[in-house]
């Protein structure tokens, strides 16, 4: 079933790739490819893994062209896809304005395919709506994460916060202004009175400890939590033979 299903959808994906897809079209393509990655994780004997990997590489090359063709216009115009620095105005501020409490959870380095493996568990606890947005360039942590909390493109927040430019040269300082960025953005959105709780979690043990005390912060209007240990694992894997043996490929990472 997995074999016949993918072979049928293979041509549909190829057709969409050749149709100059919009951002919404690219999201549809990406979802289809991730779906088959997860399917083949469970049915590794299909013999189609290499074909899927080649199709993903082909899609990546075409997506790069999509970014190259559009990015310079997106950074100066309003007619653009939703991007990560739109997160607070679009996803958070409206709920705060309605008087709702919000928990903003940023899982650094968690990919969409990783998230999809958690969906079964999460759906039993939450009503889930996935609203995609486009990463900024560079997509590295110092730029993308700071963009989320500042609500600005990197050149904009570097101009507004010149001390951040110097901090970016130091590995331990690249994201030390995030709480300030978020507070300032809330003020610009007329949400200065929001009670904010901001927390960074670097290790699993810290996460477990935080979980046991999370009730202390439930009176906050906005809980913003950054989880770093997925990103740390990703970087450590490239330097550790033990981790490479434990997580030999993308399937193992999921």
Predicted features along the sequence, with ranges:
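…; additionally, a secondary subgroup of soluble metalloenzymes is captured
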Residues: 1-102, 109-254
